[in-house]
Amino acid sequence: MEKLKSFRHLNNNIDLILNEENSTEILGAQAHIWNQIFNFINSMSLKCAIQLGIPDIINNHGKPMTISQLTLALPINRKKSPCVYRLMRILIHSGFFALQKAEVGEEGGGEEEGYVITDASKLLLKDNPMSVTPFLLAMLDPVMTKPWDFLSNWFQNGDPTPFDTANGMAFWDYGSHEPKLARFFNDAMASDARLVTSVVIEKCKGVFEGVESLVDVGGGTGTVASSIAAAFPHIQCTVFDLPHVVADLQGGNNLNFVGGDMFVDVPATEVVLLKWILHDWNDEESVKILKKCKEAISKSNKKGGKVIIIDMKVENEKDEDDESYETQLFFDMLMMALVTGRERNEKEWAKLFKDAGFSNYKITPILGLRSLIEVYP
């Protein structure tokens, strides 16, 4: 009894003694902490699968692929063959592969379970034009994960972001000096743009009705604008980005590239497109960008102008157990770690629009975690 009393005293009277009443709760709490500690294993296992080409190997097999068939097809050291099953087991648990009955033997007389791809792994295939593999490789590159080791340091210093603390410069400056990161980032944005644009063009054609000119601000290599230009030949599309981004890019009949700075001036246009731009910037910076967009619309002398924003609208916190809500919170933390931006709920979006001088807005939640937001002067 004396030892138990001393234990309680040293732990500030917090009763951590296991008994029949609290053992389940305490062990459950321990398991929850362990799960959080090792969450990174999910993403790193997926990265490994991509680097080994597992999704494409299984898909190209054309039927359920047994563990022995997969192991033989992988470019690995044969001594590591027994570990493939363990990697695939966690990837199945994560929903990237599934097991189905597979015929084995020369005459197909036996049965064994084989791996097949799922909807999630279809988005990881190399030949899929909407593949998210470039985004995955970019986000899990050591340069992008390093800032998380400096998160607590950042909270205690005066740096604008953990990325600054980790690398000694801002994310955008680092990208302009490191071709590898710039290539990863541009490829990631282009792959995402193909997926998003296909949905927007299919489900939101009315958004572009009667539009004669559109400027894609921060449009990168022009994936979004070129798709819009092809789908709507009557729209004159302009990709507006930093001079070094668009310097060597060639336009077409109704597509051109213009270099500049969105904080200084945006080319005159009827419609401004901001895809995944404003979440990179804090509220003050975002208001500046929106004001420049409003000026561009005014200069066009066209009625019915607007800003089209493709970004997240963080859902109600009551949905905190939902995977979508958690993913939105992940993105918000990512913006905090890499840049000065954030993900916003509807109230925060509305304040931005009001502060920038806009009169009204409309949110259409058709892009999964993101929404299409139309903002009117």
Curated annotation (Swiss-Prot):
Annotated active site: 279 (proton acceptor)
Enzyme Commission identifier(s): 2.1.1.-
Keyword Transferase in annotation: yes
GO MF term set: O-methyltransferase activity; protein dimerization activity
The UniProt record lists the keyword Iron: no
Annotated tissue distribution: Highly expressed in lupulin glands. Detected in early-, mid- and late-stage cones.
Keywords assigned: Methyltransferase, S-adenosyl-L-methionine, Transferase
Family matches, as InterPro entries: COMT-like, O_MeTrfase_dom, Plant_O-MeTrfase_dimerisation, SAM-dependent_MTases_sf, WH-like_DNA-bd_sf, WH_DNA-bd_sf
Protein name in UniProt: Probable O-methyltransferase 3
Protein encoded by which gene: OMT3
